[in-house]
Design a protein with these regions (language model features):
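Terminal substrate-recognition subdomain of acyl/acetyltransferases
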Residues: 2, 154-166
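Helix-loop element at the rim of GNAT/NAT acetyltransferase active sites that forms part
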Residues: 21-35
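Conserved catalytic-core motifs of GNAT/GCN5-like acyltransferases
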Residues: 120-123, 135, 140-156
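A short beta-loop-alpha structural element at the N-terminal edge
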Residues: 6-21
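Conserved beta-strand segments that form the floor/walls of ligand-binding pockets within enzyme
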Residues: 57, 69, 84-88, 97, ...
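Conserved acetyl-CoA-binding loop-helix of GNAT-fold acetyltransferases
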Residues: 95-109, 131-136
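Acetyl-CoA-dependent GNAT
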Residues: 13, 31-92, 103-105, 109, ...
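Conserved GNAT acetyl-CoA-binding A-motif
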Residues: 111-122
Length: 166
């Protein structure tokens, strides 16, 4: 099988429908995102991102197949060095390297351009594929957040993971 080449680019306001489709997929139910978001919510979020927010897209040709948000804390003097990550990959592209490409782009942006010393994220403890992806990029578990989120009718635990840059 040939290696798939992904293009990583910044999201634009007119990408809102494609991003909304990603977060409407069943795979998102395994993340901390609310399923079935409105396209209008994504239109507003991409048109007017908060200060310090970076929205990256993974594309094959011109098709958007993954999204990663990297959120910095520029107005918090004690946490300016921190970035928080959330991501999702379209259902039909799961397990094909999209998450790896997005994480590599986020780590490069954080390390080489934003001078962030710490990246953080939360992941459901039963989301093995995501957990292994984050470990591959140097993230480690810093704690378990008990009953952290409500999913599919139950409270579930998440891991708090971080990647401090040495």
């Amino acid at each position: 099988m040939d290696k798939i080449e992904f293009t990583i680019r910044r999201a634009q306001a007119n990408d809102y429908e494609a991003v909304s489709r990603i977060y409407s997929g069943r795979a998102v139910w395994g993340t901390l995102q609310l399923p079935i978001p409105s396209a209008d919510m994504w239109r507003k979020r991409l048109a007017e991102p908060p200060e310090g927010a970076f929205s990256l897209l993974a594309c094959v040709e011109n098709e958007v197949i993954g999204h990663l948000g990297l959120f910095t804390l520029p107005n918090n003097p004690r946490r300016r060095h921190v970035g928080q990550i959330g991501m999702a990959v379209r259902d039909d592209w799961q397990g094909k390297g999209v998450g790896t490409a997005l994480m590599q782009a986020a780590v490069d942006l954080a390390d080489k351009w934003l001078n962030l010393r710490r990246l953080e994220l939360e992941v459901y403890i039963d989301n093995g594929p995501a957990f292994r992806l984050y470990e591959k990029f140097g993230f480690t578990i810093e704690g378990t957040l008990v009953d952290y989120a409500f999913r599919d009718g139950h409270y579930v635990d998440t891991y708090m993971m971080a990647r401090p840059r040495k």
